[in-house]
Regions:
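Active-site-proximal alpha-helix that buttresses catalytic centers in soluble enzyme cores
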Residues: 2-83, 91-94, 107, 116, ...
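Residue-level signal for well-ordered alpha-helical positions
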Residues: 62-63, 112-113, 135
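Domain-level recognition of soluble alpha/beta enzyme cores
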Residues: 117-143, 149-150
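Acidic/His metal-coordination segments adjacent to aromatic residues that form catalytic metal sites
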Residues: 88
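Short, glycine/serine-rich, charged loops/turns that create anion-binding
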Residues: 10, 53, 104, 136, ...
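A glycine-rich beta-strand to alpha-helix segment
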Residues: 96-111
Protein backbone atom coordinates (compact mmCIF):
# COMPACT_ATOMS: atom_id res chain seq x y z
CA UNK A 1 0.00 0.00 0.00
CA UNK A 2 1.31 3.46 -0.90
CA UNK A 3 0.08 6.52 0.96
CA UNK A 4 0.92 10.04 -0.20
CA UNK A 5 0.49 12.49 2.68
CA UNK A 6 0.01 16.01 1.30
CA UNK A 7 -0.24 19.26 3.20
CA UNK A 8 -2.61 21.75 1.58
CA UNK A 9 -1.10 24.61 -0.42
CA UNK A 10 -0.87 28.29 0.59
CA UNK A 11 -4.21 29.81 1.55
CA UNK A 12 -5.58 33.25 2.28
CA UNK A 13 -5.62 34.40 5.88
CA UNK A 14 -8.79 36.41 5.20
CA UNK A 15 -12.04 34.42 5.32
CA UNK A 16 -15.29 34.33 7.31
CA UNK A 17 -13.98 31.23 9.11
CA UNK A 18 -10.93 28.97 9.12
CA UNK A 19 -12.89 26.34 7.16
CA UNK A 20 -13.55 28.85 4.35
CA UNK A 21 -9.93 29.87 3.65
CA UNK A 22 -9.32 29.64 -0.11
CA UNK A 23 -6.07 28.91 -1.88
CA UNK A 24 -4.19 31.98 -3.01
CA UNK A 25 -2.99 32.31 -6.61
CA UNK A 26 0.38 31.02 -5.37
CA UNK A 27 -1.37 28.13 -3.61
CA UNK A 28 -3.14 27.10 -6.81
CA UNK A 29 0.22 27.09 -8.61
CA UNK A 30 1.83 25.10 -5.76
CA UNK A 31 -0.95 22.52 -6.08
CA UNK A 32 -0.50 22.31 -9.84
CA UNK A 33 3.25 21.76 -9.40
CA UNK A 34 2.62 19.11 -6.75
CA UNK A 35 0.21 17.27 -9.04
CA UNK A 36 2.59 17.54 -12.00
CA UNK A 37 5.46 16.15 -9.89
CA UNK A 38 3.30 13.23 -8.73
CA UNK A 39 2.34 12.55 -12.35
CA UNK A 40 6.02 12.65 -13.39
CA UNK A 41 6.81 10.19 -10.57
CA UNK A 42 4.25 7.75 -12.01
CA UNK A 43 1.71 8.16 -9.21
CA UNK A 44 -1.61 6.52 -10.11
CA UNK A 45 -3.92 6.88 -7.12
CA UNK A 46 -7.04 4.78 -6.88
CA UNK A 47 -8.39 7.02 -4.10
CA UNK A 48 -7.94 10.65 -3.08
CA UNK A 49 -9.15 11.61 0.40
CA UNK A 50 -9.15 15.21 1.60
CA UNK A 51 -9.98 17.20 4.68
CA UNK A 52 -13.36 18.88 4.16
CA UNK A 53 -11.82 22.34 4.70
CA UNK A 54 -11.89 24.45 1.53
CA UNK A 55 -8.11 24.92 1.12
CA UNK A 56 -7.50 21.17 1.35
CA UNK A 57 -10.38 20.36 -1.03
CA UNK A 58 -9.05 22.86 -3.57
CA UNK A 59 -5.53 21.40 -3.27
CA UNK A 60 -6.89 17.87 -3.77
CA UNK A 61 -9.03 18.89 -6.75
CA UNK A 62 -6.07 20.50 -8.55
CA UNK A 63 -3.87 17.46 -7.88
CA UNK A 64 -6.65 15.18 -9.16
CA UNK A 65 -6.93 17.24 -12.34
CA UNK A 66 -3.15 17.11 -12.91
CA UNK A 67 -3.22 13.32 -12.47
CA UNK A 68 -6.30 12.86 -14.69
CA UNK A 69 -7.90 11.13 -11.71
CA UNK A 70 -11.12 9.56 -13.05
CA UNK A 71 -13.10 9.43 -9.80
CA UNK A 72 -14.44 11.89 -7.26
CA UNK A 73 -12.19 13.31 -4.56
CA UNK A 74 -13.69 12.24 -1.22
CA UNK A 75 -13.99 14.54 1.81
CA UNK A 76 -12.87 12.71 4.94
CA UNK A 77 -13.34 14.15 8.44
CA UNK A 78 -10.49 11.94 9.68
CA UNK A 79 -8.09 14.30 7.86
CA UNK A 80 -9.05 17.20 10.11
CA UNK A 81 -6.65 17.95 12.97
CA UNK A 82 -7.02 15.90 16.17
CA UNK A 83 -8.38 12.74 14.54
CA UNK A 84 -6.57 9.49 15.33
CA UNK A 85 -4.53 7.73 12.66
CA UNK A 86 -6.23 4.36 13.13
CA UNK A 87 -9.59 5.88 12.11
CA UNK A 88 -7.99 7.51 9.06
CA UNK A 89 -6.49 4.17 8.00
CA UNK A 90 -9.97 2.61 8.10
CA UNK A 91 -11.02 5.11 5.41
CA UNK A 92 -8.22 3.97 3.07
CA UNK A 93 -9.71 1.50 0.59
CA UNK A 94 -7.05 1.38 -2.15
CA UNK A 95 -3.48 0.28 -2.76
CA UNK A 96 -2.46 3.82 -3.73
CA UNK A 97 -4.12 6.72 -1.89
CA UNK A 98 -3.45 10.45 -1.66
CA UNK A 99 -4.36 12.03 1.71
CA UNK A 100 -4.64 15.84 1.78
CA UNK A 101 -4.70 17.42 5.22
CA UNK A 102 -3.22 19.82 7.74
CA UNK A 103 -0.41 20.29 10.21
CA UNK A 104 0.13 19.22 12.93
CA UNK A 105 -1.90 16.05 12.29
CA UNK A 106 -0.03 15.12 9.11
CA UNK A 107 3.29 15.07 11.00
CA UNK A 108 1.67 12.98 13.75
CA UNK A 109 0.22 10.57 11.17
CA UNK A 110 3.55 10.29 9.37
CA UNK A 111 5.35 9.57 12.64
CA UNK A 112 2.71 6.97 13.55
CA UNK A 113 3.00 5.22 10.20
CA UNK A 114 6.78 5.05 10.55
CA UNK A 115 6.83 4.00 14.21
CA UNK A 116 8.39 7.26 15.41
CA UNK A 117 7.54 9.03 18.65
CA UNK A 118 8.86 12.35 17.29
CA UNK A 119 6.29 14.04 15.01
CA UNK A 120 8.35 17.27 15.06
CA UNK A 121 10.86 15.48 12.83
CA UNK A 122 8.20 15.31 10.10
CA UNK A 123 7.02 18.91 9.95
CA UNK A 124 5.52 19.49 6.51
CA UNK A 125 5.61 22.85 4.77
CA UNK A 126 2.65 23.90 2.65
CA UNK A 127 2.22 21.91 -0.57
CA UNK A 128 4.73 19.24 0.43
CA UNK A 129 4.28 15.48 0.12
CA UNK A 130 5.59 12.34 1.78
CA UNK A 131 5.28 8.87 0.26
CA UNK A 132 5.00 5.96 2.71
CA UNK A 133 4.86 2.32 1.67
CA UNK A 134 3.29 -0.34 3.89
CA UNK A 135 2.85 -4.09 3.46
CA UNK A 136 -0.37 -3.78 5.47
CA UNK A 137 -2.23 -0.79 6.92
CA UNK A 138 -0.77 -1.09 10.41
CA UNK A 139 0.70 1.57 12.66
CA UNK A 140 4.48 1.68 12.83
CA UNK A 141 4.97 -0.60 9.82
CA UNK A 142 5.59 2.00 7.10
CA UNK A 143 8.74 2.86 5.18
CA UNK A 144 9.34 6.44 4.10
CA UNK A 145 10.06 6.29 0.36
CA UNK A 146 10.48 10.03 -0.13
CA UNK A 147 9.57 13.43 1.32
CA UNK A 148 9.51 16.43 -1.02
CA UNK A 149 8.99 20.08 -0.19
CA UNK A 150 7.66 22.65 -2.65
CA UNK A 151 11.15 23.83 -3.67
CA UNK A 152 12.12 20.27 -4.66
CA UNK A 153 8.81 19.70 -6.43
CA UNK A 154 9.43 22.84 -8.51
CA UNK A 155 12.83 21.51 -9.56
CA UNK A 156 11.29 18.18 -10.60
CA UNK A 157 8.76 19.87 -12.85
CA UNK A 158 10.95 22.60 -14.39
Amino acid sequence: VKLYLVRHASASDVAPSDADRELTKEGREESRILGAALRKAGTKPEQILTSPLLRARQTADIIARELNFPDEVTACDELLNDHPLDKLLRAVKAKETILVGHMPSLAEHLAGLLGSTNPAAFSMGKASVACVELATLRLGQGELRWFLRQKQLRLLTS
